[in-house]
Amino acid sequence: MKLRDESDIPIVGFDIAGSEWGHPADELKQSYDYAHQHFLHKTVHAGEASGPESIFSAVTSCHADRIGHGLQLFREDKIIDPLIDDKKLYISRLANFLADSRITVEVCLTSNLQTMPELKSIKEHSLSKMLDKRLSVSICTDNRLVSNTSVCKELKLMTDNFNLTEKLFKDIVVYGFKRSFFYGSYSDKRKYVGKCISYYESI
């Protein structure tokens, strides 16, 4: 926060990434609370390897504005808390909360194929369910170098494997800008997003 407030470095958000197993996001609740109380955007690596509870922790303990991956959101078999009796209802309510709150899921198709051997085909990815539930989704690379990909490659992979209308494709692209962590005022961000949409519509 000191660096953000006392320098010209455009610090826009706080993130946690790494292995989820044995390292739940809520262990960093104090850090996320601090970021939240100082008006910094927050994203959390959740639901890549661990299940829906990891995403629940990200939004309830860490005030996540965005979720990195979210792949396992709909996996009932990944729920480990014995006190959760109705797993289907738990997932339904969690997905509805994400959709209603417009918490954006950063979907990383190529990376998930590379790191999750249980994902045999991109068509098995939970992206289609996310879209069915009207979640705010953006297409991301996770990393360009290790995964040897780009946003354009990821968008093509999506269009080649999922049945998208032109409107839905545009919505996904636009969500990436609307839900970005922008360095500047909300008014400036609206102007920026407007320019992005105008450019999209011109090509």
Language-model regions, residue ranges each:
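Glycine-rich phosphate-binding active-site loops on the catalytic face of alpha/beta enzymes
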Residues: 66-78, 145, 183
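Histidine/acidic residue-rich metal-binding segments in metalloenzymes
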Residues: 1-13, 21-65, 79-103, 121-135, ...
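Short, small-residue-enriched loops and turns at beta-alpha junctions
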Residues: 18-24, 48-50, 73-75, 112-117, ...
